[in-house]
């Protein structure tokens, strides 16, 4: 099970990230002042992690055990998932989705901001959705 230390270390390893504790103790990770991941203890037992996803990933993940549309964010039509209980995702899969969230948010920044942060030009990285499609075809 992922800990705050694991979560913060992984998010901090992604390019051009910043960390702030806000919203009643949530660990909020941003790229270019835009949130890509939020970590917060649920009932002081389980680290809940909220991350942005594509429409395809949202449809795949929203009804999986231990996952749900993120409260507040998803209700406004934004595609965010919260990993809140077991079984949820493995730590490895959770890291992939956090990295994908970072990629999605980074791509939404202006080119000017991407350049300022050293994120532009992006290398062609296959999205999680593309990887899922290749697995289904193969």
Label each PLM-derived region with a short phrase.
Residues 1-138:
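Charge-dense, helix-prone N-terminal extensions
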